[in-house]
């Protein structure tokens, strides 16, 4: 495996003025990125605890990542937009020696020695630093939601990141020195899919500002000014952008490669994208945070769209061996699997196994292997029981999306005394709803040919678009709040 830091340094030596990272009006060259990260690494040297990387979209967040990797301590990205109580939970769990605060604000909850951007800019530390990271070191820890309300810190090994990056570069058909688009916040592991493959291939990492997440017109302005080649995002963010009629190959001929991860890619959205960008390479990928971003991929073509009404997630990559339990739960084994949850042995033991030096992870996803392809069939914990019938909400959503009247759909269970009493469908219709009763009848008639009566939502709520979280995923919690009043 080729060391990422060595690749970055070699490219910086050969192309010092090439732009490495860009965010709105701020940018850093490769030489600046490597120099500034070396100055930070000198300050972190010898630390045995991960550095807290605090902030939001900015070039200096990348400086923080590379600096922490060089120092060998790794980093924990913490987004400023999350609640203060959650920040405190993460800080208490990590107990950091060092914090790199890339914002202009000060936060009482930050513990340890705090560095700012200005500290690094004005530092007299040397701009040369020999990377200390080892293959078995933890390179980053990303906190995800926990069922108990306490976030879980997923620890990823450096060798796993290097292997993932090499796989991404093998998939990449656009070549080196490309303009990459990253939509995801740094606290969401989808960002890893853009950051390291981009920089390891001498590309420019273009960061989508957080204000653009629910405003496709602002993104349109960005795409007009920068010839983006490679787009990395969630399917939901891309679907929102497809509301722009100008998002097509004729207007943006430089856009020739798409990578999607983080959620299921709806057939209708993929069909629209293939139609608008017929010459582009489009990848659907799948993977949990606990297995280094993504473990499968498939190139979406018209042939694949014609063959599969529900899209597969493809075949496994190096470092990931997939299988299912008797209950249909997907299990991942190999180098891609996380080292477990930071300081949480109980939760780690529940889903990870490290026997005989082989790492395995039970995903909680239902899956099947058919015709040489893997298919994700929803979450085990998205199962509900209604009138004695056990059912998958995502199965109902998939069938709703097959209807000619439905563009997007989420199914929300309605509870009374902790019991599901009926279902409501949150629907983005394909046309304006002028007659509520007629549209409801049409959709229910469509469902009756594919689902038993007990799985059909009692009623539907019409929405212009489904709200997204800051990560660019569909915000199920917000939809439920809107529906339940």
From Swiss-Prot:
Reactions accelerated catalytically: holo-[D-alanyl-carrier protein] + D-alanine + ATP = D-alanyl-[D-alanyl-carrier protein] + AMP + diphosphate
Keyword check for Ligase: yes
Any GO molecular function: D-alanine [D-alanyl carrier protein] ligase activity
Protein residues bound to ATP: 144-145, 284-289, 365, 473
InterPro entries: AA_adenyl_dom, AMP-bd_C, AMP-bd_C_sf, AMP-dep_synth/lig_dom, ANL_N_sf, DltA, DltA-like
Keywords: ATP-binding, Cytoplasm, Ligase, Nucleotide-binding
GO biological process per UniProt: lipoteichoic acid biosynthetic process
Protein name, UniProt field: D-alanine--D-alanyl carrier protein ligase
Higher taxonomy: Bacteria, Bacillati, Bacillota, Bacilli, Bacillales
């Amino acid at each position: 495996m080729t060391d990422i830091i060595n690749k970055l340094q070699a490219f910086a030596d050969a192309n010092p003025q090439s732009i490495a990272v860009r965010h709105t009006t701020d940018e850093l060259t490769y030489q600046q990125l490597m120099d500034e990260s070396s100055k930070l690494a000198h300050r972190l040297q010898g630390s045995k605890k991960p550095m807290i990387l605090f902030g939001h979209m900015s070039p200096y967040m990348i400086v923080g990542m590379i600096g922490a990797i060089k120092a060998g301590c790794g980093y924990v990205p913490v987004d400023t937009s999350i609640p203060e109580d959650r920040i405190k939970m993460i800080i208490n769990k990590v107990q950091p020696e060092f914090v790199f605060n890339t914002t202009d604000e000060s936060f009482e909850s930050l513990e340890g020695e705090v560095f700012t951007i200005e500290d690094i800019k004005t530092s007299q530390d040397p701009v040369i630093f020999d990377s200390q990271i080892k293959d078995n070191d933890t390179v980053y820890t990303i906190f995800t939601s926990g069922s108990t309300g306490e976030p879980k810190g997923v620890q990823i090994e450096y060798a796993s990141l290097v292997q993932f990056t090499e796989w991404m570069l093998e998939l990449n058909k656009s070549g080196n020195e490309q303009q990459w688009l990253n939509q995801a916040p740094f606290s969401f592991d989808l960002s890893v899919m853009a950051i390291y493959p981009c920089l390891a291939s001498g590309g420019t990492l273009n960061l989508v500002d957080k204000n653009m997440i629910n405003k496709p017109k602002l993104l349109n302005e960005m795409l007009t000014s920068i010839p983006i080649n490679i787009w990395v995002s969630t399917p939901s963010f891309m679907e929102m952008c497809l509301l722009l009629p100008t998002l097509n190959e004729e207007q943006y001929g430089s856009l020739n490669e798409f990578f999607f991860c983080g959620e299921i890619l709806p057939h209708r959205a993929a069909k629209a994208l293939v139609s608008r960008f017929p010459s582009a390479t489009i990848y659907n990928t799948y993977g949990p945070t606990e297995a280094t971003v993504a473990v499968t991929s498939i190139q979406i073509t018209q042939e694949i769209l014609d063959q599969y009404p529900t899209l597969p997630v493809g075949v496994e990559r190096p470092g990931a061996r997939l299988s299912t339990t008797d209950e249909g739960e997907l299990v991942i084994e190999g180098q891609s699997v996380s080292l477990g949850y930071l300081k949480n042995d109980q939760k780690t033991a529940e889903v990870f196994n490290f026997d005989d030096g082989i790492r395995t992870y039970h995903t909680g996803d239902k899956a099947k292997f058919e015709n040489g392809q893997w298919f994700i069939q929803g979450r085990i914990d998205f199962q509900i029981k209604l009138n004695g019938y056990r059912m998958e909400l995502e199965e109902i959503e998939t069938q709703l999306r097959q209807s000619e009247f439905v563009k997007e759909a989420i199914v929300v269970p309605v509870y009374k005394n902790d019991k599901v009493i009926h279902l409501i469908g949150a629907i983005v219709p394909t046309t304006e709803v002028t007659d509520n009763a007629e549209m409801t009848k049409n959709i229910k008639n469509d469902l009756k040919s594919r689902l038993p009566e007990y799985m059909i939502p009692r009623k539907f709520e019409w929405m212009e678009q489904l709200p997204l979280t800051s990560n660019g995923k569909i915000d199920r919690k917000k939809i439920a709040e809107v529906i339940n009043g």
